[in-house]
Amino acid sequence: MGQELCAKRLQPGCSCYHRSEGGEAHSCQRSQPGSTEPAVFELTEASSSTASFHPRGLEAASAQKLKSKRPRSNSDSFQEENLRQGLPWKKSLPFGAASSYLNLEKLGEGSYAKVYKGISRINGQLVALKVISMNAEEGVPFTAIREASLLKGLKHANIVLLHDIVHTKETLTFVFEYMHTDLAQYMSQHPGGLHPHNVRLFMFQLLRGLAYIHHQRVLHRDLKPQNLLLSHLGELKLADFGLARAKSIPSQTYSSEVVTLWYRPPDALLGATEYSSELDIWGAGCIFIEMFQGQPLFPGVSNILEQLEKIWEVLGVPTEDTWPGVSKLPNYNPEWFPPPKPQSLQIVWDRLGGVPEAEDLASQMLKGFPRDRVSAQEALVHDYFSVLPSQLYQLPDEESLFAVSGVKLKPEMCDLSASYRKRHHLVGVNKCW
């Protein structure tokens, strides 16, 4: 079924793993400024004799095919079948070869990469092609090296699949599974907040993915709705590991400039450089409430001070009594006055109050003092999830929640895409939405 990504070097001839793909599209995975520490694994000279990447005619070195135990996900079979019928595909085409993939359309562009919707000529399945331009002097960006290195070792139903790597003289292309959408786009199509049942399923999958990577000693460091991909069934997968880092237990010194500002925890905003898995838990808590409310918790700010003020309005200003060591952090300001008192989360975000145990879980994730935050594994067994089938806790890492009988999304309360599907006779295609 697949191939293993070479853990030592990205170069023509390396072994890149491939697994059957599923799901649909997502927006561009962006890089953000980070530290410039040495690469996780050795990288050879960026240049090669192969031709440069062209989205419609890829030429690159071949890769050795190896087996994989990762099961197939669920892609949009209706759209995929139409593409299969219109494009040639051959099982004899090699993995790692540029000619094995065809570009269909551009999905987005980031600071160092462009993402295309594509199709594999090997098996006719949809893929997302993340094309990274290599600077003649600097070679491959460290974020790309880091992402490939980490994804190689992460094998889980709630982690995006890296099928293949295509290396040419001018570009490095990651071939990912093609997901239907991302959580940000999904919420924009269903404004006003998501169905509470669907929030529970999405949140369980998010925490399941986080519990897995944290157990593997990896921090994501850039959780936001745009980096959570969704299949047409509702499978949620963590994506964009460009800022992710292998971590030490319990903490390590890193850059404080991590996580998009709206989802950045107060300890990182205050300049803390020693953190562990609680960094991701704060972001997950923000996303949890955002799914209920339909809008970000702390939006519209342009600098760290304003972001902190918005957080203090809800949690209250921390003191040495409530947060030991807070006054020693670089961005701590002893003149914050008047000190707001903590508020109940359901008073600030009213939809939490309509779902039993939701506020309690959210409050355990959004603690100012990092060590007080619940872990992902602890959150998974919170009473908020007690209504879900017990079989979900016995699933192998590679198994989707939706393999359990009766687990499915419910129709959203507001669906802006319903009229489009009706006009195009697609009402029965995505039944889950």
Curated annotation (Swiss-Prot):
Q: Which family does it belong to?
A: Belongs to the protein kinase superfamily. CMGC Ser/Thr protein kinase family. CDC2/CDKX subfamily.
Enzyme type, top EC level: transferase
Which segments constitute the Protein kinase domain?
52-336
Chemical reaction(s) catalysed: L-seryl-[protein] + ATP = O-phospho-L-seryl-[protein] + ADP + H(+); L-threonyl-[protein] + ATP = O-phospho-L-threonyl-[protein] + ADP + H(+)
Task: Give the required cofactors.
Answer: Mg(2+)
Give residues annotated as binding ATP.
58-66, 81
Task: Give this protein's Gene Ontology molecular function annotations.
Answer: ATP binding; cyclin-dependent protein serine/threonine kinase activity; metal ion binding; protein serine kinase activity; protein serine/threonine kinase activity
Function comment: Serine/threonine-protein kinase that acts like an antiapoptotic protein that counters TRAIL/TNFSF10-induced apoptosis by inducing phosphorylation of BIRC5 at 'Thr-34'.
Keywords, A to Z, come to: ATP-binding, Kinase, Magnesium, Metal-binding, Nucleotide-binding, Serine/threonine-protein kinase, Transferase
Q: Residues annotated as region Disordered?
A: 46-83
Q: Which gene encodes it?
A: Cdk15
UniProt cross-references to InterPro entries, sorted A to Z: CDK, CDK15_STKc, Kinase-like_dom_sf, Prot_kinase_dom, Protein_kinase_ATP_BS, Ser/Thr_kinase_AS
Q: What is this protein called?
A: Cyclin-dependent kinase 15
- The record's active-site residues are 173
Q: Which Gene3D superfamilies match?
A: Phosphorylase Kinase, domain 1, Transferase(Phosphotransferase) domain 1
Q: Give EC number(s), comma-separated.
A: 2.7.11.22
Q: Which Pfam families match?
A: Pkinase
